[in-house]
Amino acid sequence: MVTKVKCPTCQTELEWGPQSPFRPFCSKRCQLIDLGEWADEEKRIPGEIDPELLPYPEEGEQWQ
């Protein structure tokens, strides 16, 4: 049985398998549209930011 999924960008139905090199996207175009949305911060993973993971000190703090 062939698994079919919808492209998260344009909702086109496609088969999930080696014949779909851009999966879960239907094309390179849809893949790049999604990447651009992440780069523009239109998409993000919800949650609090751990201050210990920040590369720079917050304003007013000193480097250790």
From Swiss-Prot:
Cofactor: how bound: Binds 1 zinc ion.
UniProt cofactor(s): Zn(2+)
GO term, biological process aspect, one: regulation of DNA-templated transcription
Zinc listed as a keyword: yes
Chain residue ranges for the region called Disordered: 44-64
Molecular functions per Gene Ontology: DNA topoisomerase type II (double strand cut, ATP-hydrolyzing) inhibitor activity; zinc ion binding
Gene3D superfamilies per the UniProt record, alphabetical: Erythroid Transcription Factor GATA-1, subunit A
Keywords: Metal-binding, Zinc
Annotated residues for binding of Zn(2+): 7, 10, 26, 30
SUPFAM superfamilies linked to this entry: Glucocorticoid receptor-like (DNA-binding domain) (SSF57716)
Biological function: Inhibits all the catalytic activities of DNA gyrase by preventing its interaction with DNA. Acts by binding directly to the C-terminal domain of GyrB, which probably disrupts DNA binding by the gyrase.
Similarity comment text for this entry: Belongs to the DNA gyrase inhibitor YacG family.
Subunit structure: Interacts with GyrB.
Protein name: DNA gyrase inhibitor YacG
Organism of derivation: Aeromonas hydrophila subsp. hydrophila (strain ATCC 7966 / DSM 30187 / BCRC 13018 / CCUG 14551 / JCM 1027 / KCTC 2358 / NCIMB 9240 / NCTC 8049)
UniProt lineage: Bacteria, Pseudomonadati, Pseudomonadota, Gammaproteobacteria, Aeromonadales
